[in-house]
Amino acid sequence: MYEYLDRRYALALYQVAEKKGKVDEYLQDLREICELIENNHEFYEVIKHPQISTKKKKKTFISIFKDKIDEELLSFLLILIEKDRILYLREKLNEMEKIDLERKNTLKGIIKTAIPLLSNEFDNLRDIFQKKYDKNILFETEVDRNLLGGVYVRVGHDVIDDTVKSKIEEMKDLMLKQK
């Protein structure tokens, strides 16, 4: 429901970071702040608590982050506190990362195999998909012995499942339909 709003916040912050040449710095700082919010229970409770005033929450953020992060980024966080959206910072970060990938003409993908890929196999797969999508692709690799063999590739919403496990499932489904 708030995806559009998250994207607008993220785009505004991205444009500020881009003008300052600090996109990577902002992204890294946001990741660390999200981890702090998500992993520090006391901090989370303070910023979540409805009886702690917005003013006190802002003072807390200023005392923690002043001189540690860029002023514009701190101002952004204070706006989120003001709008009661700070607990949804992760969504803004996710959108900002998507914008960054779009600007860099890059997609994310995953390659799953039953055994680790050799570097030349990985390079060949990456080259094939970069040509197909005409974009750079950042692949994560994962070894899943349950696949038995073959390769599973997902780029965006596109999936190519050429694993032994999927072929066995297809044969099983076909045999069950014939009964």
Curated annotation (Swiss-Prot):
InterPro entries, alphabetized: ATP_synth_OSCP/delta_N_sf, ATPase_OSCP/d_CS, ATPase_OSCP/dsu
Family, per entry: Belongs to the ATPase delta chain family.
Record's subcellular location: Cell membrane
Xref: NCBIfam families: ATP_synt_delta, PRK05758.2-4
Free-text function comment from the UniProt entry: F(1)F(0) ATP synthase produces ATP from ADP in the presence of a proton or sodium gradient. F-type ATPases consist of two structural domains, F(1) containing the extramembraneous catalytic core and F(0) containing the membrane proton channel, linked together by a central stalk and a peripheral stalk. During catalysis, ATP synthesis in the catalytic domain of F(1) is coupled via a rotary mechanism of the central stalk subunits to proton translocation.
GO cellular component, one term: proton-transporting ATP synthase complex
Assigned keywords, A-Z: ATP synthesis, Cell membrane, CF(1), Hydrogen ion transport, Ion transport, Membrane, Transport
Native species: Clostridium botulinum (strain Eklund 17B / Type B)
Example GO molecular function: proton-transporting ATP synthase activity, rotational mechanism
Superkingdom per UniProt: Bacteria
Lipid bilayer topology: Peripheral membrane protein
Name the UniProt record assigns to this protein: ATP synthase subunit delta
Record PROSITE patterns: ATPASE_DELTA (PS00389)
Main location: membrane
Subunit structure: F-type ATPases have 2 components, F(1) - the catalytic core - and F(0) - the membrane proton channel. F(1) has five subunits: alpha(3), beta(3), gamma(1), delta(1), epsilon(1). F(0) has three main subunits: a(1), b(2) and c(10-14). The alpha and beta chains form an alternating ring which encloses part of the gamma chain. F(1) is attached to F(0) by a central stalk formed by the gamma and epsilon chains, while a peripheral stalk is formed by the delta and b chains.
Pfam families recorded: OSCP
